[in-house]
Amino acid sequence: MRGAVLRLGAARGQLRLEQEHLLEDIAHVRQRLDDEARQRQEAEAAARALARFAQEAEAARVELQKKAQALQEECGYLRRHHQEEAQAEARDALKCDVTSALREIRAQLEGHAVQSTLQQEEWFRVRLDRLSEAAKVNTDAM
């Protein structure tokens, strides 16, 4: 009987030891679960930020396309208008130097086109820099 009591005591000690190990394993698994949940939330936040970035970039692209189309239409209008004016001036004043007038008008049109293009490029660079900073912040946050 004494041997049975000793065996039961040893078994009890072994069970307590196993229980402690199981509690440690449970705590470790919970910590891993918490870490993975946090990482998943961070990844989801980064994915949302990238989706917003993509939407903003697409909106900027569409806006720039609209501006480019408007500039092309304006350029076509200016060309037509210029041609009409040049023809009227040629009829009114044959002595006028048509070549120099056309060069001057063309230079003005090119100057306006270059200025407009530069303004668009600057706007796009600023917007792209802002979006890149936001993406970098989100990437750093991950």
UniProtKB/Swiss-Prot annotation:
Claim: Coiled coil is one of the keywords in the record: yes
Keyword tags: Cell projection, Coiled coil, Cytoplasm, Cytoskeleton, Intermediate filament, Phosphoprotein
Domain IF rod: 1-142
Pfam families associated with the record: Filament
Description of post-translational modifications: There are a number of repeats of the tripeptide K-S-P, NFH is phosphorylated on a number of the serines in this motif. It is thought that phosphorylation of NFH results in the formation of interfilament cross bridges that are important in the maintenance of axonal caliber.
Annotated Gene Ontology cellular component terms: axon; neurofilament
Coiled coil (residue ranges): 26-74
Superkingdom to which the source organism belongs: Eukaryota
Family to which the UniProt record says this protein belongs: Belongs to the intermediate filament family.
Function text: Neurofilaments usually contain three intermediate filament proteins: NEFL, NEFM, and NEFH which are involved in the maintenance of neuronal caliber. NEFH has an important function in mature axons that is not subserved by the two smaller NF proteins. May additionally cooperate with the neuronal intermediate filament proteins PRPH and INA to form neuronal filamentous networks.
Protein name (database record): Neurofilament heavy polypeptide
Lineage: Eukaryota, Metazoa, Chordata, Craniata, Vertebrata
